Amino acid sequence: MVGGMSTWLARRVFAAAAACAIFAACAPRAATFATRSSGMGIDPFGHTRMSEPRASVPPDEMAHTQRLLALLRNDLVQYRDPAAAERDGFLKQGDDVPVGALKHFFKYENFAKNRTHLDPKAPAAILYRRTANGFELAGVMFTAPISAPMDELDRRIPLALGHWHSHRNICMPPKGAPMTTHAQRAPFGFEGTITTRAACDAANGVFLDNVYGWMTHVYPYAPTLADAF
């Protein structure tokens, strides 16, 4: 079981989440590491909720954020090669992604650690950007409980900088359902037309009121502080 889901469902959810996070635009890159993605994209059916932005970062939180970025820059060097991340339990899920898009390598056990606090050494996922020659280290993803208030999210990653988001009211297709045509896929997943439990039940799907709580990406090798989140 992963986060209360069967392993099969968890893997399918992760694959769908990763597919939802593919965006074509690419920001400028540092010399050795990729940087951030282009944003959350369009969500016509309201499955994505964003955190409430704040106007500024208090000095103590800014110091905390700078320490976090420094720790991540130092620790993530060991995962420049995705094979090293996989050896440490970060698993690549879903299909390949196009050049320029992000790929998530998830570590299931770290989701439990993220429930209580943000540990720089226990990200829920490591992010790689697809290149013509493979994958380039980009950053990490952290999570927090869906019940976490804005003040708690702000303590972990300041809301004036970070973009916490949550995926809600998702209907996953039933196991074994054919998903080869657009009509078969359209009702389900993170961009699906189904948004209620009743409609999901009618389609014999698996309804998730949220998927792994709040999430945020951090790009510690970005050229500016604003680009790091």
Task: Identify the function of each model-found stretch.
Residues 15-20:
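Sec-dependent N-terminal signal peptides
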Residues 2-14:
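Bacterial N-terminal signal peptides that target proteins for export
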Residues 33-126, 130-229:
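Primary mode marks residue(s) on the alpha4-beta5-alpha5 output face of response regulator receiver
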